């Protein structure tokens, strides 16, 4: 049966596709679109694929229904016989692969139900698979056997040493032997090589199977099916798998290695639609897609759809290109032809090879593995071919040819070809990897991507991809300038919005200036009437509305920051202007920083790296907000003096001595903790300084803030007499701070006795006069309210049973009389007419 020849009439006549070429052979172009060309030898076209309806002889794969012979892979349902792989349901006799139900006798494949006797094929079902698939012309050529017979004989001819010719060995035994035994060392190579003889593209059919198999399947097919599903095709693709199309061992390995390097089965065959081979590049798109590539009956074109070219007809062009390439020893074309072979197209590409040198491509591939030089020479073509095989799954049925064409015609599009082969439906990752490595030394990375990038997904290449994200500048130009028209005309008008950055040297102007509302400007320009009597520098702390706490920042605006140049200009303008007419609420004016002091401040900050001191500098520059106490402390001590003191810098400033003494004081009270010792020292230093001096004022302000909690009230109350004396001798501003401190103490019943002593009450009552500031009077009234609340609550009796209310009661009565008189005086001042009438 192995030697039996299939009659030309027995071969099914696939429909002739437009552009399909008929190869010189026993079959005519019209009758058999897949013509076998005696390209190489009469060896069985193991691994050949029928174009569409053609049945595959050993190593041939039917596109859809054909059964697989040994070395051929059934699509899905075929059962594996010795050396054969069942597609799914069909049972295969050794060397044969049934697609569905048909059983193949040795070397013969039935399309559907028909059973093929080895070497014999039903006319309709057994299309000259040899011819259609691989252009079995090689087989008939070598043996003089009809192409049909050549195809029929098993793949067993592999290097097992029994290279059966079309008539040689029985299909069954050969196939079985080939799968199990003949290919032990070189799984794919031996079985397929017999086809075209050593060095030839014998593997073309076998490795060309469109449907990729699970690696398990690989084992069955005459060694072509490597464990990784390299099968003829797979072996070709798998790393060192034997020749893809029953090539000579070296050549086969070369190709397979070449591809296997990066792709296990880069384009061995797509499992589903994508399996179409580029090889089927006959003029008819349908042939190329249906015949052998798509065992499932899908168009090979999808698989091979070139990413760049998606024209179905391309493959015809490609075929020509491939042929040229094969002749020029381009592995790519060879691959395309070898694995894409639809009947005629396979022949055509083989023909070209035969004409030029069918073995050339195979050798080239084999040599490539062996010889890196060859690999470099042919890499692009081969990659292109590979791309066709894996890249385009389900794109166009007619693309099978197109993909092939791309591979051939565009050696530069290596990644395209490789992408296609590696990309296929389920085996994309494995397919792409093998093909790329060898084919493209330059674009190896590009080729490889196809194999690993998409898992079970179609490749989709966009020539003009949109960026995933738009890159935008993260930083604004520091040198960006504001338009002169948008700049504030006066300092009262606007301040620049705070922008974090260096606090000296280079300032960062705000790019979004904002104008202060008119109400705010009016308040900045003129203080309310009721603030006229306020002590200097304490206007914001006025108690005009005792029920509402004063805001931390005027108008609740964020701190503003100006550049160094702007601050210099502003300070010079303030010095040149009259102090009475100058009104500004900026931090520099609040801290009373002069031009000379500001320059010293900048010099210090250039030399200092202490983070704590930098925080102070940020406050002075307006870059950082600060509490009122902190601002007052910096203002009273002087920003430069404060920094020098903290750094132990020598300074000639008089006011620095206070800070030095305060910071470097000796703890005279061993029984007190550090903070308590510090508070006692501050009280002593404050009272020791001259009245109304800056050092004294600074100490009082510090104590005022320390009395916000009751923890230190008792300590400070010990110095009550000294602070009460200041209420009689100090100016309005010093009185204000002393009264604010005493107001905090008045809330604590524990110190009420000392605070409201007879001496204290007389001093408080003496403050009710027309000459005293309204703020100070308001504070005294608030103090009496606090003590009144303490007495009413009964807390006073619990703390001190000896506390006498008589002095307080008399003080309250006197206080009421003074309050009425004071109110009358104020009313008379506000309404002169009423004063005259009275």
UniProtKB/Swiss-Prot annotation:
GO molecular function: amyloid-beta binding; G protein-coupled receptor binding
GO process terms (BP): hematopoietic stem cell homeostasis
Name assigned to this protein: G-protein coupled receptor-associated sorting protein 2
PANTHER family assigned to the protein according to its UniProt record, in alphabetical order: G-PROTEIN COUPLED RECEPTOR-ASSOCIATED SORTING PROTEIN 2, PROTEIN BHLHB9-RELATED
GO cellular component: cytoplasm; cytosol; nucleus
Tissue specificity comment: Expressed in the brain.
Compositional bias per record (Basic residues), positions renumbered to this chain: 255-271
Pfam families: Arm_2 (PF04826)
Quaternary structure annotation from Swiss-Prot or TrEMBL: Interacts with cytoplasmic tails of a variety of G-protein coupled receptors such as muscarinic acetylcholine receptor M1/CHRM1 and calcitonin receptor/CALCR.
Start and end residues of each stretch annotated as Disordered: 1-122, 218-292, 349-368, 531-552
Function: May play a role in regulation of a variety of G-protein coupled receptors.
Entry's family note: Belongs to the GPRASP family.
Compositional bias annotation for Basic and acidic residues: 13-31
